[in-house]
């Protein structure tokens, strides 16, 4: 059975954001506005998404 995934898209710039939030975007694999990555839906990934919820859009 395939693992559940979630699509995350960066919608706002990381310029002027807290360094921890920039690092979280990098950890999610996001590089620029409009960049989309598909990640496994794990509690750790969900925690990272919750940390930068105001800069990303999530699709299940």
UniProtKB/Swiss-Prot annotation:
InterPro entries: Ribo_uL30_ferredoxin-like_sf, Ribosomal_uL30_bac-type, Ribosomal_uL30_CS, Ribosomal_uL30_ferredoxin-like
Molecular function GO terms recorded: structural constituent of ribosome
The family this protein is said to belong to: Belongs to the universal ribosomal protein uL30 family.
GO biological process, one term: translation
Protein name: Large ribosomal subunit protein uL30
Domain of life: Bacteria
Family annotation (Pfam families): Ribosomal_L30
Stretches that traverse the bilayer: none
């Amino acid at each position: 059975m395939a693992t559940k995934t979630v699509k995350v898209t960066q919608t706002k710039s990381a310029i002027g954001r807290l360094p921890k939030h920039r690092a979280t975007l990098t950890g999610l694999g996001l590089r620029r506005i409009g960049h989309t990555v598909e990640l496994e839906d794990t509690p750790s990934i969900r925690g990272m998404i919750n940390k930068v919820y105001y800069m990303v859009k999530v699709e299940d």
